[in-house]
Amino acid sequence: MKAICIISGDVHGKIYFQQESANQPLKISGYLLNLPRGLHGFHVHEYGDTSNGCTSAGEHFNPTNEDHGAPDAEIRHVGDLGNIKSAGYNSLTEVNMMDNVMSLYGPHNIIGRSLVVHTDKDDLGLTDHPLSKTTGNSGGRLGCGIIAICK
């Protein structure tokens, strides 16, 4: 199965999702433009609603009610993808990752939800900041889009 997310906002780009079956990892690839230099939190959020910009996307997709964590952590939100790294505004930021928790299949699938690029680095739930266990203290939302099935 394949899906696509067209990111818009201060940051824009295309992110593709591909998964051969429910038992296989999810491949996430694509690019972003106009992303400031540094690390930026990258998460699937609970709602596929961008009617009020990225704020209407809700919180991180967390159907299992876990604390926020790194993509490879045992305890994490389903929607936690960690950070993406940008070389700066004038560069293309490539995205290429695999995830073993997120899926395009089953009751916790991400189809119809939103993908959000954040202003700040995701601390992966590892700091004492009050937002660390809920958002990774990753700040505001630079861009977002709705994940949709594609050919």
Swiss-Prot record:
Binding site for Zn(2+): 60, 68, 77, 80
Cystine connections: 54-144
Membrane-spanning parts: none
UniProt cross-references to SUPFAM superfamilies, sorted A to Z: Cu,Zn superoxide dismutase-like
Top-rank taxon: Viruses
Catalytic activity line of the entry: 2 superoxide + 2 H(+) = H2O2 + O2
Cofactor details (free text): Binds 1 copper ion per subunit.
Signal peptide range in chain numbering: none
DNA damage is among the record's keywords: no
GO molecular function, one term: superoxide dismutase activity
Binding of Cu cation, residues: 43, 45, 60, 118
Cofactor annotation: Cu cation; Zn(2+)
Keyword Zinc among UniProt keywords: yes
Purpose of the protein: Nonessential for normal virus replication. Could be either non-functional or with a low activity.
Family according to the record: Belongs to the Cu-Zn superoxide dismutase family.
Protein name: Putative superoxide dismutase [Cu-Zn]
Origin species: Autographa californica nuclear polyhedrosis virus (AcMNPV)
Highest classification ranks of the organism: Viruses, Viruses incertae sedis, Naldaviricetes, Lefavirales, Baculoviridae
